[in-house]
A protein has these predicted regions:
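Hydrophobic anchor at the beta1->P-loop junction of P-loop NTPases
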Residues: 13
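Conserved substrate/cofactor phosphate-moiety recognition/catalytic segment
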Residues: 30-68
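P-loop (Walker A) phosphate-binding loop of NTP-binding proteins
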Residues: 16
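NTP-dependent small-molecule kinase module
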Residues: 142-209
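A glycine- and Lys/Arg-enriched "phosphate-lid" helix/loop adjacent to the NTP-binding pocket
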Residues: 95-167
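Post-Walker A alpha-helix
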Residues: 24-25
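Glycine-rich phosphate-binding loop used to anchor ATP phosphates in small-molecule kinases
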Residues: 57, 61-126
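Conserved lysine of the Walker
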Residues: 21
Length: 209
């Protein structure tokens, strides 16, 4: 008899606001013919309110993202198809929520509640086979944020982006949940240059072959 092993490839793309995660997700999905899972920013009912009044809406927003990404991971497992995911469940818990808490924009009880819920969910999900981290300088992030022109992002401060960048670097430095590929996007333009995109594809192929 024949034993069939269904091996699903799950690639996730991580990075700060404006790093180019969504663009790269689309490009890689097209190249590999994988399904794509995007971060829910279009239908998110809390984003506008959060950027206008962070302290009031931080917990609501983080719970919404946690719920959304947990559902994505559940769907990835149940669908049984190769997928590229725009941002991971780990970024909320290791970067965004603790940053809001440290800045005094999320209360102790809300943060403990959030963290408890994440820890419970984390026990039931599988980490990505490959995590791609898009590393970027603050000036580059600011340039990209202004270029794409999302109105709710106009109020994002340099300090906020810098704090997130510091937490991203600390998280990536200790990441051991699977294969990791770090791409410095200050030195590469995968949007305008097909050659640069191919360089990324070659690096991915080397990691997952």
């Amino acid at each position: 008899f024949e034993i069939k092993i269904n091996w699903i490839m799950h690639i996730a793309i991580a990075g700060n606001i404006g790093a180019g995660k969504t663009t790269l997700t689309k490009s890689l999905g097209k190249h590999y013919k994988y399904e794509v899972e995007f971060e829910d920013v279009v239908d998110n009912p809390y984003l506008d309110d959060f950027y206008n009044q962070m302290e009031r809406w931080s917990f609501n927003l983080q719970i919404y993202f946690l719920n959304s990404r947990f559902r994505q991971l559940r769907d990835i497992i149940s669908n049984g198809r190769n997928v590229i995911q725009d941002r991971t469940i780990y970024e909320d818990a290791n970067i965004f929520a603790p940053n809001l808490h440290a800045m005094g924009l999320m209360t102790n009880r809300d943060y403990k509640n959030y963290r408890s819920l994440f820890d419970l969910m984390e026990e039931t999900v599988k980490s990505p086979d490959l995590l791609i981290y898009l590393r970027s300088s603050i000036p580059n992030l600011v340039s990209q944020i202004h270029k794409r022109g999302r109105e709710y992002e106009n109020s994002i401060s340099i300090e906020y982006l810098s704090r997130l960048n510091e937490r991203y670097e600390a998280w990536i430095h200790s990441y051991e949940k699977g294969e990791l590929l770090v791409i410095d996007i200050d030195d590469i333009d995968f949007v305008e240059s097909k050659g640069d995109l191919q360089k990324i594809i070659d690096l991915i192929d080397e990691k997952v072959k």
